[in-house]
């Protein structure tokens, strides 16, 4: 799929059909590999020149917003597809591939009545896209919250012994619990194990001799048990910390372990459900935003053509997709098809300043022109 298109508008002197034929002929002759399509814009409500000029101040900003939301949803789709391991699907608008929707654009009269003022159409587009963006933020935040909880659990299960969950490393038989005795779990730096074995019995009184047993070792630490009298447990923790050993809090509970397993399974299920629903929502919403964007491009082309070529509306709007190597050639063809007087006028410094911030790259050409990137 081509990812870069030009939307251009050429001034019509005789008839749009004759200009269209000349454009096709010139493209076929000098740049045959450049696809060219009519961009069918209906007769929109012009309003006053003042209203057009006021609208022009907002066109570029509104375009950036709508395009930005479109790209944001596309990036979210790509991330979700990558995480899910699903094959990327071609994005569509009402079942039509996005490039085909652009090149065969048809104005949606039911959604955007052509008799509505242009400002009202633009505000309507921006309002609809803003609602979708707000919905996206809420849905992504909900998904990321579940994902964050799972990541935190995974870090605890796969992190170092200083932070990870110990429940799956400690068996019931490793723990001695009675009225007077308690078993503590000490996290010992990997290269300090000899020091631990040499001193743990003397860190405080009433430590059971030879009670320390290694349960697990990772790249940084080793996990040891030690059994002692309950009444000296706090003193042992303090003495161990002073020696560089960490005594982890731990409570052996089969019920608690089962509860954690159930919570983890539910989080995994919730994440998969949210990911699937978010991906489907993104597919649908991308189509809605892309459709809104193309209608906005039609309004923008119409408004800028009136401001460039005057009233009544007399212009030919089309979509081209030249290869990079053919761009200069196609620009030259488009320029030759413009009226020479208009070419000089719209290339003047006065025009460049007046149209700056309005027509994107159009101030450098004697015709309306801006680029649409689909990737």
Swiss-Prot record:
GO terms for biological process: unidimensional cell growth. GO terms for cellular component: chloroplast; extracellular region; Golgi apparatus; plant-type vacuole; plasma membrane; vacuolar membrane; vacuolar proton-transporting V-type ATPase, V1 domain; vacuole. One of its GO terms (molecular function) is proton-transporting ATPase activity, rotational mechanism. It comes from the Eukaryota. Keywords: Hydrogen ion transport, Ion transport, Membrane, Phosphoprotein, Transport, Vacuole. It is a peripheral membrane protein. InterPro entries: ATPase_V1-cplx_csu, Vac_ATP_synth_c_sf. SUPFAM superfamilies: Vacuolar ATP synthase subunit C (SSF118203). It is found in: Vacuole membrane. The keyword Phosphoprotein applies. Phosphorylated on Ser/Thr residues by WNK8. It holds the Pfam family V-ATPase_C. The keyword Membrane applies. Belongs to the V-ATPase C subunit family. V-ATPase is a heteromultimeric enzyme composed of a peripheral catalytic V1 complex (components A to H) attached to an integral membrane V0 proton pore complex (components: a, c, c'', d and e). Subunit of the peripheral V1 complex of vacuolar ATPase. Subunit C is necessary for the assembly of the catalytic sector of the enzyme and is likely to have a specific function in its catalytic activity. V-ATPase is responsible for acidifying a variety of intracellular compartments in eukaryotic cells. This is V-type proton ATPase subunit C. It comes from Arabidopsis thaliana.
């Amino acid at each position: 799929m081509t990812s870069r298109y030009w939307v251009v508008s050429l001034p019509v002197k005789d008839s749009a059909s004759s200009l269209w034929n000349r454009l096709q002929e010139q493209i076929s002759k000098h740049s045959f590999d450049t696809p060219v399509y009519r961009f069918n814009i209906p007769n929109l409500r012009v309003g006053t020149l003042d209203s057009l000029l006021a609208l022009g101040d907002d066109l570029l900003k509104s375009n950036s917003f709508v395009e930005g939301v479109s790209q944001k949803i596309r990036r979210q789709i790509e991330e979700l597809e990558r995480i899910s391991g699903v094959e990327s699907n071609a994005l569509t608008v009402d079942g039509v591939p996005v490039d085909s929707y652009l090149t065969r654009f048809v104005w949606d009269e039911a959604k955007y009545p052509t008799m509505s003022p242009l400002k009202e159409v633009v505000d309507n587009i921006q309002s609809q896209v803003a609602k979708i963006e707000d919905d996206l933020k809420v849905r992504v935040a909900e998904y990321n919250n579940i994902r964050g909880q799972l990541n935190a659990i995974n870090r605890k299960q796969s992190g170092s012994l200083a932070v990870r969950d110990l429940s799956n490393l400690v068996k019931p038989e490793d723990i001695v619990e009675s009225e007077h005795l308690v078993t503590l779990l000490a996290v010992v730096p990997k290269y300090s194990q000899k020091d631990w074995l040499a001193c743990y019995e003397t860190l405080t009184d009433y430590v059971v001799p030879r009670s320390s047993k290694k349960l697990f070792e990772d790249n940084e630490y080793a996990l040891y048990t030690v059994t002692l009298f309950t009444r000296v447990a706090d003193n042992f923790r303090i003495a161990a910390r002073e020696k560089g050993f960490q005594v982890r809090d731990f409570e052996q509970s089969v019920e608690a372990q089962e509860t954690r397993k159930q919570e983890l399974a539910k989080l995994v299920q919730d994440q998969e459900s949210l990911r699937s629903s978010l991906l489907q929502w993104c597919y649908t919403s991308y189509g809605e935003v892309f459709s809104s964007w193309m209608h906005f491009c039609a309004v923008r082309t119409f408004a800028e053509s009136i401001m460039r070529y005057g009233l009544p509306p007399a212009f030919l709007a089309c979509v081209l997709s030249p290869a990079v190597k053919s761009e200069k050639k196609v620009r030259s063809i488009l320029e030759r098809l413009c009226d020479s007087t208009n070419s000089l006028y719209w290339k003047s410094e006065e025009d460049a300043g007046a149209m700056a911030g309005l027509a994107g790259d159009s101030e450098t050409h004697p015709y309306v022109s801006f680029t649409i990137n689909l990737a």
